Regions:
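Short aromatic-glycine-(Arg/Gly/Cys) micro-motifs in beta-strand/loop hairpins
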Residues: 1-49, 66, 75, 94-141, ...
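Short, mixed-charge low-complexity intrinsically disordered segments
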Residues: 43-95, 140-144, 148-193
Length: 193
């Protein structure tokens, strides 16, 4: 797995339309159900995967008064892309070089997400949450695959069946705490100036 960046999201509870009773919340890499900060892209601090190389940048795009609504995630990406029935080496964008993972992050699962354009900004959809496939596959309470092997099997299936168009990427999702604390926000602001 390759360290790929950081992103803060407003994690949403499982919607009623997702019939996966063991799922409590949506922590997928997709922004479809659990979005990032409004207009985060306008800051243009992200890398070629649509994540941030620095924790301070991931936190810095969130308005100060709303930071308690967000949770901070780190992502590690599998070195292969799943396309149709084939696998190929991941073409990692040159600007993906995140700072070392700070202490306190823990793995909460794995996702398999689509990207329909090689030049696209970020990963787009997670069939587990976006297409309710969490009701058909083994997932944890975060709507993520519990193991890397399960996520790879999911990517193989999704790439072949195309519940969402595009190539599929496997990502480990790590969380740095239940919420972005004011002290982290203040430190992030100082670090980004």
């Amino acid at each position: 797995m390759i360290d790929a960046g950081y992103f803060a999201k407003r994690v949403q509870p499982r919607p009623d339309c997702l019939p996966a009773s063991g799922v409590l919340e949506i922590c997928s890499v997709s922004e479809c159900l659990s979005p990032g900060a409004d207009d985060w892209i306008a800051s243009w601090r992200h890398n070629g995967l649509g994540w941030f190389n620095r924790v301070s940048d991931a936190v810095g795009v969130i308005p100060e008064k709303r930071r308690d609504e967000y949770r901070l995630f780190a992502y590690r990406i599998h070195p292969e892309v799943f396309r149709g029935r084939e696998r190929s080496a991941l073409p990692l964008p040159d600007d993906v070089h995140p700072e070392p993972l700070p202490a306190g992050f823990r793995s909460i699962g794995f996702d398999s997400a689509s990207r329909s354009s090689v030049g696209g900004l970020s990963l787009e959809c997670s069939p587990l949450s976006c297409n309710a496939m969490a009701s058909e596959m083994p997932v944890n309470e975060h709507c993520l695959f519990p193991t890397l092997d399960a996520a790879i099997a999911g990517a193989v299936r999704f790439a072949a069946e195309q519940p969402e168009p595009g190539d599929y990427y496997v990502v480990e999702v790590l969380e740095g705490g239940p919420r972005i604390e004011p002290s982290l926000s203040a430190n992030a602001e100082r670090a980004s100036t």
